[in-house]
Amino acid sequence: EINKSLDGILSQEGIHIRQWYVCPHARKDRCQCIKPNPAFLIQAARDYDLDLRHSFVIGDHPHDVLTGEAVGAFGLYLLTGHGPKHLDELPQDNLIFHTLGDAAGWILKHPNAERDITCDIQLGAEAIRRGGLVAFPTETVYGLGADVFNTDAVARIFEVKKRPLHNPLIVHVSEQRQVKPLVTNISKTAQKLMERFWPGPLTLVLPKADIVPDIVTAGNPTVAVRMPANQWARELITLSQTPLAAPSANAFGRTSPTTARHVEDQLHGGYDVLIDGGACRVGIESTVLSLAGGMPLLLRPGGVNQEEIVEITKAIEIFHPQNKTGKRFESPGMMLSHYAPTTPLRLVDDVAPYANRSDVGVILFQNSAICFQSPASVLSPGGDLREAAANLYRVMRKLDAMGLSLIVAQRAPDNGLGAAINDRLNKAAVKSPPNCQNRA
């Protein structure tokens, strides 16, 4: 039955199975998962005269992917089955996908695998140097990037996204040394945070140097900087020979994109090059921390937990959007309303009253004993915050496309990544009209 299901999924994408191999398995190391033996790959290569260097291995355990790569194949990782549980064991440069269909679709578009990705990155870098816009993957969400020093290109980002000019952009670098020309000072605390969390989902707001155009910083005396963990993003920045100013690659205020298809659906070609790097590993935006004043100020929760930051800073203040005065923002993600689907959304503690509403979509944090007649999607069956964060925007988009009258989301535990999940859902719910929020 499993093989039949896989056959059907792959056939829909245009990939047809010629033969199934029985794969020898063995239990190893700390994990109770059953691991394949590479012998079946070598046997398949002999039977069909395959060059494994031009072949693909798709699996939901790091062992699957690394086994394939060990014999020369290109590995694709699925966030199904054991996938979420073992994601931390997977090297950062491996591509990940939410479904087998997504992985199959990527293979058909990139038959030469790494060579095709390299070509896309080179085309992207050439576009950046010409003053163009490139949509590219990071570990958080897909970004829409331009040369930070090209004001015309940066202005086009605001135009394509319909983004207000008072909302600044994050500058992305591929090496720490690229930060120094952008700022007037790097404090000891900033240096420690960079060493601990970079490359990774932490943005630091620092005093800006005059070389950074005001359009990037919305006229603020500070600049937001981060180094993405995604290998392809850093390679794009390096080949572009400039830091990139890059917000999320979506229409302003709407749900952020975590796959290339999400970018296509929202921006409709408002870019010169789109680099398809699979699904985003973290799935929500970076944490933003301002070090421009006295006490470190958390402007936006994100991929790095507040608890982890405090281990270095010792103390921290929290920004609350409702206390904001004036129109200027020090970084992205500070507005009251953001990340919203087109369908009204409400954040609740108890989703049970909506269980029998066919016109209401339900976002569950984890598996529930309630039997839902309404469309329901689970962020993490086992209640894992990391898995829930990675699925959040995908699930929001899925329910948003169903023509529902309302989406209700179950609040996550407010610790670790849960704070970032609830922040996104709270902001996505702000624009929901009162009559939608109060229906039950």
Where are the language model's segments positioned?
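Hydrophobic alpha-helical segments with strong N-terminal bias
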Residues: 9, 21, 326-328
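A structural preference for short, hydrophobic beta-strand core positions in alpha/beta folds
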Residues: 20-22, 77, 347, 378
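Short low-complexity, flexible loop/linker segments enriched in glycine and/or proline
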Residues: 1, 91-94, 260-262, 424
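Asp-based, Mg2+/Mn2+-dependent phosphohydrolase catalytic module
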Residues: 4-19, 26-57, 61-113
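Conserved residues at the C-terminal ends of beta-strands
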Residues: 23-24, 58, 79, 99, ...
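Active-site-adjacent structural elements in enzyme catalytic cores
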Residues: 112-440
